[in-house]
Amino acid sequence: MSLPTTSSPLTNDQEFAKPVRNGKIFENPKSFTNWGGRPGLTNIFKLVLRETSHENLPSDKKVLDSTLPVHNITADDFHSESGLFATWLGHATVLVDLEGVKFVTDPVWADRASFTSFAGPKRYRPPPMKLEDLPDLDFAVVSHDHYDHLDADAVKRITNLNPQIKWFVPLGLKKWMKNQGIGADGSNTVTELNWGESSEFVKNGKTITIWCLPAQHSGQRGLSDHNHRLWSGWAVIGENRRFYFPGDTGFCDVEFKKIGEKLGPFDLAAIPIGAYEPRWFMKSHHINPDEAVEVHKLVRARNSIGIHWGTYPMGTTEYYLEPRDKLKELMDAREDLKDTSFVTVDMGEIWEASDR
């Protein structure tokens, strides 16, 4: 039997930051000194009209198969003797087994990361695993409501395939989930948390603690719901293993340091490394590889894998393989991080934690 218990706020001396709430609107706190605000129409036009894209995404599938291989897998392939293993399913979707508890982050299988099926960012690398081939899932975490992180069809299908699943979401998303028919019957299928709150998930007598954590970002799905739903990162803490997922985020270094001090070290972090150029436009919302390496260090990750790249064209201007190449270059140069690992993996490749 598995169930989430009631949430509890952080009680340590130095608490995590809280979002600012103005009526229906959530905002990043003033302590996020790298937050530059929401890009206005002038900046959006400047991005479209003046910036040159260096993405150079190949149109030839054979080239993509070579540069970004996808290993098709099923639930039967997702196994290991390790107490922690994971596979990247594309973009920000990671399937994790932590001490026998299986969960997924930001499940997105959509062909387009958009409100419509005929426009918007079109997926150029397929998921390595069909929704129907997922193992039985215990829970899922959602970082925010942007279409490349929250796929309504996938959420509904996963719930139908896994009636026992629990969803952990930041403030404001529980109502959206209910509108999709998830938890609409009054069940405890959906647990909604604020930054610095946690919930315990119990399976076969084993307790997993799930933390909702600060992230520097925003939210929106329609024309009139900007920041009506909060954004967050997540930590999943087992008896012996720890996992961290920042979601989408700019570089809020003070909070990353707190996360590392309070909840680290992490055996695995899945850290975004893509969709970051031009910096004048993207810096507030997305870390780049340089900042991702600093996040890896600040949260005290023993191992990290790079995500949020190589899946959808996100309207940014960096070369499509630059996130991977830049990350390797940066890590090769960091003598202070030689005892840790921060790498990229192929979609469908099984990553396993080593014995400690």
From Swiss-Prot:
GO BP term (any one): phospholipid catabolic process
Tissue: Expressed in interneurons that are in close proximity to the primary sensory neurons. Predominantly expressed in the pharynx but can also be found in cell bodies of the dorsal and ventral nerve cords.
GO molecular function: N-acylphosphatidylethanolamine-specific phospholipase D activity; zinc ion binding
SUPFAM superfamilies the UniProt entry points to: Metallo-hydrolase/oxidoreductase
Gene3D superfamilies: Ribonuclease Z/Hydroxyacylglutathione hydrolase-like (3.60.15.10)
Residues noted as binding an N-acyl-1,2-diacyl-sn-glycero-3-phosphoethanolamine in the record, renumbered to the chain: Y147, H286
The reaction(s) this protein catalyses: an N-acyl-1,2-diacyl-sn-glycero-3-phosphoethanolamine + H2O = an N-acylethanolamine + a 1,2-diacyl-sn-glycero-3-phosphate + H(+); 1,2-dihexadecanoyl-sn-glycero-3-phospho-(N-hexadecanoyl)-ethanolamine + H2O = 1,2-dihexadecanoyl-sn-glycero-3-phosphate + N-hexadecanoylethanolamine + H(+); N-(5Z,8Z,11Z,14Z-eicosatetraenoyl)-1,2-di-(9Z-octadecenoyl)-sn-glycero-3-phosphoethanolamine + H2O = N-(5Z,8Z,11Z,14Z-eicosatetraenoyl)-ethanolamine + 1,2-di-(9Z-octadecenoyl)-sn-glycero-3-phosphate + H(+)
List of residues binding Zn(2+) 1: H144, H146, H217, D248
Cofactor binding note from Swiss-Prot or TrEMBL: Binds 2 zinc divalent cations per subunit.
Binding site for Zn(2+) 2: D148, H149, D248, H308
Key words, A-Z: Hydrolase, Lipid degradation, Lipid metabolism, Metal-binding, Phospholipid degradation, Phospholipid metabolism, Zinc
GO CC annotation, single: neuron projection
Family: Belongs to the NAPE-PLD family.
Name under which the protein is recorded: N-acyl-phosphatidylethanolamine-hydrolyzing phospholipase D 1
Gene: nape-1
